[in-house]
């Protein structure tokens, strides 16, 4: 009987361990699916309200060990959304609320890289030269994350050249956008770049290609202003 009891204990232990492993695999799978949906909501559906709301729920409802990290990430998301809407001062203020010390170390490298890139773009559009210099240096020193740093550095340099330096930079003409939001962004800066070259026909064509997209985006708002000014 004792041997049978021990055998049952081992069996139930194995069943319990198997169930726990299955549960963990399911949780990880659902997290991957959730992140994919959120990514598509921004980059392809471009639904800023739903995108922000999904991160708000994550920040408010996540389990306690993750909550601080998700709350800090939500500040980033709010900064990202206000930037896309063209409220650069509000974006700056949201980014400044982020406390990286509250972020889990395994997530901090990625958030720091994206945050520094975001702060640099905000500074460029606010024409804040000291801040541009500071965040350029921060971005150059930032550790890479998911092999994405080189792309962010190149994009930031191109935007700085076109918007702040008023110099031609063909990055947005020679690089393929990865999604719908990127295509809109590339068309906008490509149009500004065409204007710097004196090619108003190409600028008009690029502005026209995005003028009917989500009007919340400042890229679209500026394209519409340009086209209205021509009429």
Could you tell me what each predicted segment is?
Residues 26-104:
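N-terminal topogenic membrane-targeting module
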Residues 62, 66, 103-107, 178, ...:
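Structural signature of alpha-solenoid helical repeat scaffolds
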């Amino acid at each position: 009987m004792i041997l049978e009891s021990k055998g049952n204990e081992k069996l139930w232990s194995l069943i319990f361990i198997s169930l726990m492993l299955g549960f963990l695999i399911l949780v990880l799978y659902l997290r991957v699916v959730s992140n994919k949906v959120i990514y598509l909501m921004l980059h392809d559906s471009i639904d800023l309200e739903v995108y922000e709301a999904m991160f708000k729920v994550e920040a408010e409802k996540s389990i306690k060990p993750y909550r601080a990290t998700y709350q800090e990430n939500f500040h980033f998301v709010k900064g990202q959304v206000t930037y896309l809407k063209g409220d650069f001062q509000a974006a700056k203020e949201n980014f400044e609320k982020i406390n990286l010390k509250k972020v889990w170390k395994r997530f901090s490298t990625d958030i720091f890289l994206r945050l520094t890139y975001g702060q640099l773009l905000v500074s460029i559009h606010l024409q804040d030269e000291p801040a541009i210099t500071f965040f350029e240096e921060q971005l150059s020193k930032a550790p890479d994350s998911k092999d994405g740093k080189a792309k962010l550095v190149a994009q930031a340099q191109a935007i700085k050249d076109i918007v702040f330096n008023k110099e031609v930079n063909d990055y947005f003409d020679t690089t393929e956008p990865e999604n719908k939001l990127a295509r809109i962004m590339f068309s906008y800066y490509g149009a500004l770049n065409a204007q710097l070259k004196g090619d108003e026909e190409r600028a008009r064509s690029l502005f026209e290609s995005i003028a009917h997209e989500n009007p919340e985006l400042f890229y679209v708002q500026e394209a519409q202003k340009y086209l209205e000014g021509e009429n």
